[in-house]
Amino acid sequence: KSAMMVIAVDALAARSIKRLNRTIQITDTGIIPGSGVGNYRNAITEEHLGIPVIAIGIPTVVDAATIIADFCMGLMEENKSEPEEMEASVRSLISPKLNTMYVTSKDIDEAVNRLSFTISEGLNMTFVPRV
């Protein structure tokens, strides 16, 4: 017998520090591992595998530029700056080198354990028949 479906779980790069280890994204379009950090791998999609792919992603890393941008936007919002001014100011502060430096929280092990349990419980509730 061959597989009827693939369920792929992947770590994602967050676009906001507020989402780090706090959201779970689900899609039926598959995933391209490493694409969020510029480390592209072969796609895991229905097109490539010939069977449906459900992708579950958890933002577990964030680039340094995002951390700085979130911080600066917070400061500028407190000072009631105009949105256009805020964005221009933040972009001028962020070095392109910071877009390639990724960090995670110091409690990543605990967060991954908690998130993996949550995902496994959801999958069990979905696919394991109740007796």
PLM regions: where:
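N-terminal small/polar loop signature for handling phosphorylated ligands or for N-terminal nucleophile
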Residues: 1-2
